[in-house]
Amino acid sequence: MSHWATFKQTATNLWVTLRHDILALAVFLNGLLIFKTIYGMSVNLLDIFHIKAFSELDLSLLANAPLFMLGVFLVLNSIGLLFRAKLAWAISIILLLIALIYTLHFYPWLKFSIGFCIFTLVFLLILRKDFSHSSAAAGTIFAFISFTTLLFYSTYGALYLSEGFNPRIESLMTAFYFSIETMSTVGYGDIVPVSESARLFTISVIISGITVFATSMTSIFGPLIRGGFNKLVKGNNHTMHRKDHFIVCGHSILAINTILQLNQRGQNVTVISNLPEDDIKQLEQRLGDNADVIPGDSNDSSVLKKAGIDRCRAILALSDNDADNAFVVLSAKDMSSDVKTVLAVSDSKNLNKIKMVHPDIILSPQLFGSEILARVLNGEEINNDMLVSMLLNSGHGIFSDNDELETKADSKESAQK
């Protein structure tokens, strides 16, 4: 039985640590499956880059080119998932939905590709709460995908509307040159749209080019600029020497009040929160100037190591999600077996499951509050020692029988005094 419990705990720890990497690998494999599908076609998509005039264009090449680009985008986007970027998660959902619809319509016999795509979509939706980070890498991927799509559209659009320009666009290189010239809004005037359709097309390229450029620059350089501006205004961020401190995981009301109370008593506290970047700023303002907040997943071993788990006094899992609290304790004990753990339980139904992770202290504020209310309404006497005993035992049986007897004995001695 002990071997099974050890295996179960190890498997749980591996799942918590590697689930995001597994998901990124699944998205990457979806891209490879698309490449495998293209490789088996009789049409060579690379021939599309050797076209010199529109008259040489085989429409079958253009029909399959989006599938090739879809595979490229999925492979690139899997990198963003490794950083748990919210933007990468959203783009992956969109790309996989497009791939699923495309495959169902044109290649319905590819059962494995369809099934694996559906599995990855479900996997992404299940882990949606884990992807809340803002990442420069994800912004770079988004910028590359947007720029590549716009370049493809503008180049072959100009080649398709070649007769609407003066002079006429007759080669792929000329169309590519016109696309870059228009997207950058340089406009040398050597190629001028003369037909109505060509002018409307040029307007769409100009607007799209400005939008993609502005969005890309914001996604990539925005976080860097904001960080530099904050340092300029506020000075260097307070860096706490993380030793003999408390680690609080979560941003619940209980967690925030606990942090404030510990700070009032001069204790050093490091907070781990998976809130979005803007909400992290609000949390830091609420906790004060000396707040030491680490953005990230409290189940991630690298985040716990950064928080100084091997040098802390205790780690407190105080989020509103009982499962997340249990995973925090499992991850903490896996990294440092001697660390003291405190776990908050919101739902009494989860108490028996919570006990399996063996935290040092289990607190159940809801059960504690209901017990106090029942005693008050029943007219029972309540003193400070009884309140402490009830709070520490709100998790039902977190101490051994000897510990409970010692607590009761101490309460009697205090009452006699």
UniProtKB/Swiss-Prot annotation:
It holds the Pfam family TrkA_N. Residues 243-363 form the RCK N-terminal domain. Keywords: Cell inner membrane, Cell membrane, Ion channel, Ion transport, Membrane, Transmembrane, Transmembrane helix, Transport. It comes from the Bacteria. Its main location: membrane. Residues 42-63, 105-110, 161-199 are periplasmic. It is found in: Cell inner membrane. A motif (Selectivity filter) lies at residues 185-190. Residues 1-21, 84-86, 128-140, 221-417 are cytoplasmic. One of its GO terms (biological process) is potassium ion transport. One of its GO terms (molecular function) is identical protein binding. One of its GO terms (cellular component) is plasma membrane. The chain crosses the membrane at residues 22-41, 64-83, 87-104, 111-127, 141-160, 200-220. InterPro entries: K_chnl_dom (IPR013099), NAD(P)-bd_dom_sf (IPR036291), RCK_N (IPR003148), Trk_Ktr_HKT_K-transport (IPR050721). Belongs to the potassium channel family. K(+)-specific ion channel. May play a role in the defense against osmotic shock. Dimer. This is Voltage-gated potassium channel Kch. The gene is kch.
